[in-house]
């Protein structure tokens, strides 16, 4: 069920990208809060989900998204290309969530509903193990896996967002997945 909600939110976010206009960004830069709300609204649910994955806490995620909203409102005049609003906003969300992680290391809740039709008991067992495994990862690994798997961001876009070469991002995602698998295997053996 939650996976369907996330899919719908991501579809809405993509639709929001198509609706971004230079005029809307310009109005927001001039202080039009309504225009800013129209810019960010399609992205909020997905941003909240990503922030929750990174911070591991609903309250911290909400604070991180709120911080990202404030930062993006204040820095909107620095957005060079209105069509890149989604990537620009995502970068701010990732930075904000990462900032919260540095101060608070907590257990991360992952949604495994997308894993398929697994028996609910097995799903809950897997969820707990994966949650503990994900929480054991370094925050940088969490960010990479969130970008790559949760947001399904192409490597080129992730590289641009993180300011890294594409090959480095590919390599780091690969190694982050290996570390997640190792942590998960350790949880299964417990």
Regions found by a protein language model. Name each.
Residues 135-143, 151-168, 178-182:
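Helix-turn-helix DNA-binding module
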Residues 2-12, 27, 123-124, 132-136, ...:
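C-terminal edge and immediately downstream basic/flexible tail or linker adjoining helix-turn-helix-like DNA-binding
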Residues 4-9, 14-21, 99, 105-133, ...:
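Internal acidic/polar
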Residues 12-15, 27-38, 48-67, 166, ...:
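Short, charged helix-capping/linker segments at alpha-helix termini
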Residues 29-30, 53-56, 66-84, 103-107, ...:
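Sigma70-family region 2
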Residues 39, 43, 47, 68, ...:
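Residue-level preference for hydrophobic side chains embedded in well-ordered alpha helices
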Residues 42-45, 54, 146-154:
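Short helix-capping/turn signature of helix-turn-helix
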Residues 74-81, 91-111, 123-126, 175, ...:
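Arg/Lys-rich amphipathic alpha helix in sigma70-family domain 2
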């Amino acid at each position: 069920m939650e996976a369907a909600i996330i899919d719908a939110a991501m579809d809405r976010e993509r639709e929001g990208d198509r609706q971004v206009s230079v005029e809307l960004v310009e109005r927001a830069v001039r202080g039009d809060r309504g225009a800013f709300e129209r810019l960010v609204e399609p992205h909020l649910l997905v941003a909240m989900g990503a922030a929750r994955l990174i911070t591991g806490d609903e309250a911290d995620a909400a604070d991180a998204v709120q911080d990202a909203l404030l930062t993006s409102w204040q820095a909107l005049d620095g957005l060079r290309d209105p069509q890149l609003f989604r990537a620009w906003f995502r970068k701010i969300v990732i930075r904000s969530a990462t900032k919260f992680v540095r101060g608070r290391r907590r257990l991360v809740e992952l949604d495994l509903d997308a894993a398929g039709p697994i028996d609910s008991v097995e799903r809950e067992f897997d969820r707990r193990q994966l949650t503990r495994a994900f929480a054991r990862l370094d925050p940088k690994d969490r960010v990479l896996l969130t970008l790559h798997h949760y947001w399904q961001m192409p490597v080129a876009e992730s590289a641009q967002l993180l300011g890294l070469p594409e090959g480095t991002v590919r390599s780091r995602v690969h190694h982050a997945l290996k570390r997640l698998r190792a942590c998960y295997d350790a949880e299964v053996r417990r």
